Amino acid sequence: MTVNVFTPDTFGVLDDEQIQYQQLLIRTFESTVEEIKTLLVEKKIIAHVPVSQGKDSTVVEIIVIEAYRRAIAEGLIESDRPLILSTVDTLNESIPMKMYPTFAKRRIEAYAKEKGINMYYDMVTPGLNDEYFVKFTGG
């Protein structure tokens, strides 16, 4: 029988440069949330965020949802202000990428409801004549 000994000093250690980078990311996130809150309050916008549930659009989605959550919690905007998210299923994705947006949508909707955010999340597909396969093979 082999016994592995856990040594914490070889696992999960961040150097100063990595810590500074993480702190920069946190400051950037916080300032971006504040900028979105400013738009929500001063310009009275209704945000529409197109999301693919990939890395980039998910970061934007998280920032906007957090700005709504904070603005509502602080009484800066009305809780019935809509937040609109939309995802396009191109009908040309791999099976995991086809499944993940639906999986994520349910969880995002539950989170928004829990936080009192009036979110509308629409998932759309192109019409038959606009499908990639039809356009690609149809000449």
Identify what each model region corresponds to:
Residues 2-139:
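ATP-dependent adenylation/nucleotidyltransferase module used to activate substrates
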